[in-house]
């Protein structure tokens, strides 16, 4: 039970941008925001159990948070981890069912 809860916390959200949309259409790759402490093995296990697709390889990147200003005040966004997940041929993955 504890292991299942950990798997649910590994994947945070899909990362949607122009670059990721192009990569997803051109190649069989998913781009997800994941927990900063998650390992490649944990990400692979979570994808396998939650979405039931086979993972070929995973590349991870830690994205540095930006400095933001609001008037004189300076704030910082936190760092986060992005995972590029390559699926085997024939494996299809849709985050939103019924999307047109």
UniProtKB/Swiss-Prot annotation:
One Pfam family, short name: Ribosomal_L23
Keyword Chaperone assigned: no
One cellular component term from this protein's GO annotations in UniProt: ribosome
Molecular function GO terms recorded: rRNA binding; structural constituent of ribosome
One BP term from GO: translation
Keywords attached to this entry: Ribonucleoprotein, Ribosomal protein, RNA-binding, rRNA-binding
Subunit details: Part of the 50S ribosomal subunit. Contacts protein L29, and trigger factor when it is bound to the ribosome.
Protein family according to the UniProt entry: Belongs to the universal ribosomal protein uL23 family.
Protein name in the entry: Large ribosomal subunit protein uL23
Organism per entry: Baumannia cicadellinicola subsp. Homalodisca coagulata
Gene field: rplW
């Amino acid at each position: 039970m504890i292991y299942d809860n950990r798997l649910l916390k590994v994947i945070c959200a899909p990362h949607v941008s122009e670059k990721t949309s192009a990569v997803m259409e051109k190649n069989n790759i998913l781009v997800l925001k994941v927990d900063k402490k998650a390992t490649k093995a944990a990400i692979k296990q979570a994808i396998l159990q939650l979405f039931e697709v086979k993972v070929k390889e995973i590349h991870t990147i830690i994205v540095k948070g930006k400095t933001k200003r609001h008037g004189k005040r300076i704030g910082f966004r936190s760092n986060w981890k992005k995972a590029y997940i390559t699926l085997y041929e024939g494996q299809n993955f849709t985050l939103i069912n019924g999307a047109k």
